[in-house]
Curated annotation (Swiss-Prot):
<comment type="similarity">
    <text>Belongs to the FrsA family.</text>
</comment>
<dbReference type="InterPro" id="IPR050261">
    <property type="entry name" value="FrsA_esterase"/>
</dbReference>
<keyword id="KW-0378">Hydrolase</keyword>
<dbReference type="InterPro" id="IPR043423">
    <property type="entry name" value="FrsA"/>
</dbReference>
<dbReference type="InterPro" id="IPR010520">
    <property type="entry name" value="FrsA-like"/>
</dbReference>
<dbReference type="InterPro" id="IPR029058">
    <property type="entry name" value="AB_hydrolase_fold"/>
</dbReference>
<comment type="function">
    <text>Catalyzes the hydrolysis of esters.</text>
</comment>
<dbReference type="Pfam" id="PF06500">
    <property type="entry name" value="FrsA-like"/>
</dbReference>
<keyword id="KW-0719">Serine esterase</keyword>
<protein>
    <recommendedName>
        <fullName>Esterase FrsA</fullName>
        <ecNumber>3.1.1.1</ecNumber>
    </recommendedName>
</protein>
<dbReference type="GO" id="GO:0106435">
    <property type="term" value="F:carboxylesterase activity"/>
</dbReference>
Length: 414
């Protein structure tokens, strides 16, 4: 496979690529307070993107590698959209966020091609896939260079899956009224059909960002993981996010009886951030098909309906929301009105009794997901569990929280 040649073809120079921070044209709020969150990273002065070190390290990237790439971006004297923001270099060249992370990914891609040990080669491919995803972050619609990086990430992920333990199958699901979508079914060693977790990821992530979750938490317990991309990104890019946020995941859930490797009588959903919006909707609409729903840092009501909460959120995250909703040119007021319709409380779901067991994990003072959202989820369930995750030490508590969530899921599936 000529991955290097593919890279050259995809990133072939053109006249002018749009720079990521210009893709969503909203009225800026001006100066914002600093934000730090376990799942989303933190705002750092002079960066448009939130720097999500915890999640990048959790996915396997060395902290020194992150700093090296950041340093190359900072040191560039190329033209920027905003001279005050390091990661707004225009065009695919040195200093551009996508260029620097993709260049780093190509280093690991070359290591993977040269490595004779299949498992080590698979690790290198996975590392490259993760770096390509960081290159494409935050995955805004219309970001041509980011979409090319996503394509390279998916290719690298497929290469990794052929070499790593267990089995991965790429699956296509038909969706009435539109294009089919592609998902990845990750299966542990042993004979199926397997109890399965349907992953509902955040809006600023790709489905290939969750391999660590499968490898460290689900696979050792004999649980499979099925992923699909959220609407408007990756393999689901032809679908826009709508108030029926769980449309694609619901279609996949209904198709599981026809998937021989999945025990469709033992399925749970796990939602990160806005993915919890999807998972909780499924808990209400498809309770006979789900044994349990777990959420982490859920975005189900407050951020979607509270103007003060929205004012505390970084510009990049609001751009992500606007991009997913297809509101690239909307005013902040129009965006607020539309976001309110995505609140599961406003929709009349949360607050009603739900038969599906639901767990929700949260951090105190989380700017994206206050404790009240998690309490709303668990108090609405006939079998609810609230899990507070202490912030420091952040990595250790994140791991401990995921272990507790996996324990809870396993008890309801196995």
């Amino acid at each position: 496979m000529t991955q290097a040649n593919l890279s050259e073809t995809l990133f072939k120079p053109r006249f002018k690529h749009p720079e990521t921070s210009t893709l969503v044209r909203r009225f800026n709020h001006g100066a914002q307070p600093p934000v730090q969150s376990a799942l989303d990273g933190k705002t750092i002065p002079h960066w448009y993107r939130m720097i999500n070190r915890l999640m990048w390290i959790w996915r396997g990237i060395d902290p020194r590698e992150i700093l090296d790439v950041q340093a190359r971006i900072v040191m560039s004297d190329a033209e920027r959209t905003d001279d005050d923001l390091y990661d707004t270099v225009i065009g695919y060249r040195g200093g551009n966020w996508i260029y620097e992370w993709a260049t780093q990914a190509m280093v690991w891609q070359q290591k993977a091609c040269a490595e004779e040990d299949p498992q080590l080669s698979g690790r290198h491919w996975l590392h490259a896939a993760t770096l390509y995803n960081i290159a494409a972050y935050p995955h805004l619609k219309g970001d041509d260079l980011a979409e090319q990086a996503q394509a390279l990430s998916n290719r690298a992920y497929e290469e990794a899956a052929q070499r790593l333990p267990g089995t991965m199958r790429q699956m296509e699901f038909t969706v009435p009224g539109g294009a089919p979508i592609t998902g990845f079914l990750h299966m542990p060693k042993g004979d199926g059909p397997f109890p399965t977790v349907l992953m509902c990821g955040g809006l600023d992530a790709m489905q290939t960002d969750y391999y660590s979750l499968y490898e460290r938490y689900f696979a050792p317990r004999g649980i499979a993981m099925l992923t699909i991309d959220m609407p408007s990104v990756g393999f689901s890019s032809k679908w826009k996010l709508t108030q029926d946020s769980c449309l694609l995941h619901q279609r996949v859930l209904k198709a599981l009886p026809n998937v021989p490797w999945v025990d469709h009588t033992r399925v749970a959903a796990f939602g990160f951030r806005f993915g919890a919006n999807v998972a909780v909707r499924l808990a209400y609409l498809e309770s006979p098909r789900l044994k349990a729903v777990a959420c982490l840092g859920p975005v189900v009501h407050t951020l979607l309906s509270d103007f003060k909460c929205q004012q505390q959120v970084p510009e990049m995250y609001l751009d992500v929301l606007a991009s997913r909703l297809g509101m690239h040119d909307a005013s902040d007021e129009a965006l607020r009105v539309e976001l309110n319709r995505y609140s599961l409380k406003v929709q009349g779901l949360l607050g009603r009794r739900c038969p599906t067991p639901m767990l929700s994990g949260y951090w105190k003072n989380d700017p994206f997901s206050p404790e009240e959202d998690s309490r709303l989820i668990t108090s609405s369930s006939a079998d609810g569990k609230l899990l507070e995750i202490p912030f420091n030490p952040v990595y250790r508590n994140f791991d401990k929280g995921l272990q507790e969530i996996t324990d809870w899921i396993e008890k309801r599936l196995c």
